[in-house]
């Protein structure tokens, strides 16, 4: 029996949290990310990872979640196949924590962040590096990265 893809498992977990979030929007406050000063004062460092589990549910369409999961699947699947489960997870979590720290430092004291975008942008970076090493065409990936970056400021 073929083992389940790590990417599919992550998507299932994140989407499961989103469904729970629809029933209890307080989960965003439990798992979302604060600005660095509040993060330090509360000592809730787990939020650097749990931020990926919660997404905006304030509108009727889960656009933020959909874009993150589409990117996770589109980028994560070939990266996991090429590099293996362990290296994929290292890239995912290092990117997630790095993106969360960058976000926390830029938020200020009362800022708040949600979503898996930090991990997704890390996967974009890994995809570009792999593509360059394999002499692949990465121009279209760069365009998608730019579009996702711009979209991040509109959602």
Which residues does each predicted region cover?
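A detector for small-residue-rich transmembrane helices and their helix-helix packing motifs
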Residues: 1-155
């Amino acid at each position: 029996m073929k083992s389940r893809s790590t990417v599919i498992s992550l998507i299932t977990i994140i989407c499961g949290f989103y469904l729970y979030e629809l029933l209890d929007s307080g989960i965003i406050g439990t798992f979302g990310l604060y600005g660095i000063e509040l993060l330090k004062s509360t000592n809730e460092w787990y939020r650097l990872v749990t931020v990926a589990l919660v997404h905006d549910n304030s509108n009727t369409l889960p656009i933020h979640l959909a874009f993150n999961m589409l990117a996770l699947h589109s980028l994560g699947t070939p990266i996991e196949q090429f590099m293996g489960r362990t290296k994929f997870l290292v890239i995912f979590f290092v990117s997630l924590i790095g993106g969360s720290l960058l976000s926390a430092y830029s938020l200020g004291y009362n800022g708040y962040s949600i979503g898996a975008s930090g991990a997704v942008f890390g996967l974009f970076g890994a995809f570009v590096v792999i593509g360059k090493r394999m002499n692949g065409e990465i121009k279209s990936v760069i365009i998608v990265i730019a579009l996702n970056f711009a979209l991040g400021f509109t959602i």
